[in-house]
């Protein structure tokens, strides 16, 4: 007597139904030019979403300045009242506008460098980290 095993039928499903399709586009050359199979019309459509098995391209932040705005918003939202306040190291106590302007002998960095300094509390001007816990 043969008993039907419905679980076995799942093993016979095509792999395309179980896993997402592979990224079958041809790779570009080392200098970032067009691949042999890509057309200008395909490039005009913009980047395509990649599957899990596709190429491992990291998504880049489209507007790094937005990260700075988010960091400022997090500082002023409700974390000040929690007893732990992080002070932006490049910012003087009395002036709000001088936080992103470099001083005379200071190196200038991009917005991501400023964000790293603000989130980590690192200050090149003062030569180290500065954290404040509690109230002023």
Swiss-Prot record:
Question: Where primarily located?
Answer: secreted
Report the subcellular localization: Secreted
One GO cellular-component annotation of the UniProt record comes to: extracellular region
Keywords carried by this UniProt record = Amidation, Neuropeptide, Pyrrolidone carboxylic acid, Secreted, Signal
Q: By its UniProt entry, which InterPro entries does this protein fall under? A: P518
Q: Which residues form the signal peptide?
A: 1-18
Q: GO molecular function, one example?
A: orexigenic neuropeptide QRFP receptor binding
Which GO biological-process labels does this protein carry?
grooming behavior; locomotory behavior; neuropeptide signaling pathway; positive regulation of blood pressure; regulation of feeding behavior
Pfam families tied to this protein: RFamide_26RFa
Residues with PTM Pyrrolidone carboxylic acid: 91
Q: What does this protein do?
A: Stimulates feeding behavior, metabolic rate and locomotor activity and increases blood pressure. May have orexigenic activity. May promote aldosterone secretion by the adrenal gland.
Question: Would you identify the family this protein belongs to, as annotated?
Answer: Belongs to the RFamide neuropeptide family.
Quaternary structure note = Ligand for the G-protein coupled receptor QRFPR/GPR103.
Q: What is this protein called?
A: Orexigenic neuropeptide QRFP
């Amino acid at each position: 007597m043969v008993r039907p095993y419905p679980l076995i039928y799942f093993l016979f499903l095509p792999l395309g139904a179980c896993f997402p399709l592979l990224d079958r586009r041809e790779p570009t050359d080392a200098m970032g030019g067009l691949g042999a199979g890509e057309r200008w019309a395909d490039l005009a459509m913009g980047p395509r979403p990649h599957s899990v098995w596709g190429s491992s391209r990291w998504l880049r932040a489209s507007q790094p300045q937005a990260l700075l705005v988010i960091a400022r918003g997090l500082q002023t939202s409700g974390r000040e009242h929690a007893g732990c306040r992080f002070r932006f190291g490049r910012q003087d106590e009395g002036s709000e506008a001088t936080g992103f302007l470099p001083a005379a002998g200071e190196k200038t960095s991009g917005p991501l460098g400023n964000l790293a300094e603000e989130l980590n509390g690192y200050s090149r001007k003062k030569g180290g980290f500065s954290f404040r816990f509690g109230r002023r």
